[in-house]
A protein has these predicted regions:
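GIY-YIG nuclease catalytic motif and its immediate N-terminal context
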Residues: 1-63, 67-71, 97-98, 111-118, ...
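Conserved short hydrophobic interaction patches
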Residues: 72-75, 130
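Acidic, metal/cofactor-coordinating or nucleic-acid-engaging core segments within structured domains
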Residues: 74-108
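Mixed-charge intrinsically disordered linker/loop segments at interdomain junctions
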Residues: 129-138
């Protein structure tokens, strides 16, 4: 039995969103404040600038980018900040403090707004598949 698939316009939409996200201006976590991030829903990618290159570390989506990027990823505890948890679990950082300092010193965020929850999920999945970030893929429920 053949599965019904979306038309080519949908694939083009995902590709356009991917390129829009990658071409968004990267913003360093070291200069991140709540007012620098819009309080809108969207998809984001966190990269670590290592040896002059932006290495994809994490792709995510949120109903509130300001909350997710600033309050959770940068300022939040391990329960809300998956990237910090992954940095510690992998041994890249030795503690919560060290993970936060790594994010502030090395990480950058890019984001695009997207109001529709299903579309956000599709964009997140597409971007994750294309960038294959260092963290965030291996957990299954």
């Amino acid at each position: 039995m053949k599965i019904q698939t979306p038309d080519n316009q949908w694939l083009q939409y995902l590709q356009d969103a991917y390129h829009q996200l990658l071409s968004a201006a990267p913003f360093p976590f070291s200069k991140l404040t709540p007012s620098t991030i819009p309080a809108v829903s969207g998809v984001y990618v966190i990269t670590a600038k290592l040896d002059g290159k932006h290495v994809p570390y994490y792709v995510g989506r949120s109903k509130n980018l300001r909350q997710r990027l600033y309050k959770n990823h940068l300022m939040g505890p391990l329960t809300n900040a998956r990237l910090k948890k992954y940095l510690i679990k992998s041994g890249e950082c030795g503690s919560l403090h060290e993970a936060k300092e790594f994010i502030k010193a090395c990480c950058w965020a890019r984001w695009i707004g997207e109001p529709d929850i299903r579309v956000r999920g599709a964009i997140e999945g597409y971007v994750t598949g294309m960038l294959f970030p260092k963290y965030g893929i291996y957990e299954e429920h």
